[in-house]
Amino acid sequence: MSDINIKIGLAEMLKGGVIMDVVNAEQAEIAQQAGAVAVMALERVPADIRKDGGIARMSDPKLIKEIMSVVSIPVMAKARIGHFVEAQILESLGVDFIDESEVLTPADELNHIDKDSFKVPFVCGCTNLGEALRRIGEGAALIRTKGEAGTGNIVEAVRQLRQVNKDINYIKNADKSELMAIAKNLQAPYDLVTYVHKNGKLPVPNFSAGGVATPADAALMMQLGAESVFVGSGIFKSADPLKRARAIVSAVTYYNDAKILAEVSEDLGEPMTGINCDFEKFSQRGW
């Protein structure tokens, strides 16, 4: 078992950057060239998982090793919710982070992975503060919004990040005598609720994911308080992946500078084809 503070420290190093989904070594090299702080190795981006249907599982270890061999930046990989054996395999490969991801088909509808039993740090998604604190209680070192991956639609990520921020502000301003009741209502560990009350933030970095397709989307999430951004289908489902990837990296760096945002948003070609969120929602997987 690894010290959670070491894991959180590794996650802190990704702040202010972009983590990009890649499905092969060539895309991984493009992501690194564009300035990504990490890549997420997977066989299909979320848009294709939605399109193809079926059961989405951990990627082939051969693919993950190929991607790890061509980049020097951290490599993440996804395991199904509750599938601790997939996580054991990924840890044995030497990935830098494991994402216990709702994008893949859940393996356990009741239990998430005991992340404290692993040396590798875990990323987990949330839709609200209670969900975030439950994952942190299990050992997650990094939290992200779930959004709605594969849609190119930012609305759910915005809703979720605003909800987390609203919940944090409520707890920060609550009377200490109310914290146990709040913990009960959130179904969250009491010690983590008291941490939020004292510090006004999560005890781990808080990133955004799910639906980021443009530089403006990325800057929006940063202005709303995200500390970094995951981009899945939005880059390599667009007309010019390298140019769009560089633009999104710049947007995360200069998220408060509208002039730079306007410049990097010019002439990017067609973005990914977006879809509405009126269908099965990946964000409802897990609890």
Curated annotation (Swiss-Prot):
Enzyme class per UniProt: lyase
Binding site for D-glyceraldehyde 3-phosphate: 162
Taxonomic superkingdom: Bacteria
Keyword terms: Lyase, Pyridoxal phosphate, Schiff base
Catalyzed reactions: aldehydo-D-ribose 5-phosphate + D-glyceraldehyde 3-phosphate + L-glutamine = pyridoxal 5'-phosphate + L-glutamate + phosphate + 3 H2O + H(+)
Signal sequence coordinates: none
Active site per UniProt: 78
Annotated binding of D-ribose 5-phosphate, by residue: 21, 150, 211, 232-233
Listed EC numbers: 4.3.3.6
Molecular-function annotations in GO: pyridoxal 5'-phosphate synthase (glutamine hydrolysing) activity
Subunit structure: In the presence of PdxT, forms a dodecamer of heterodimers.
Matching NCBIfam families: PRK04180.1 (NF003215), pyridoxal 5'-phosphate synthase lyase subunit PdxS (TIGR00343)
Cited function: Catalyzes the formation of pyridoxal 5'-phosphate from ribose 5-phosphate (RBP), glyceraldehyde 3-phosphate (G3P) and ammonia. The ammonia is provided by the PdxT subunit. Can also use ribulose 5-phosphate and dihydroxyacetone phosphate as substrates, resulting from enzyme-catalyzed isomerization of RBP and G3P, respectively.
Assigned protein family: Belongs to the PdxS/SNZ family.
Record-given protein name: Pyridoxal 5'-phosphate synthase subunit PdxS
Species in which this protein is naturally found: Francisella tularensis subsp. holarctica (strain LVS)
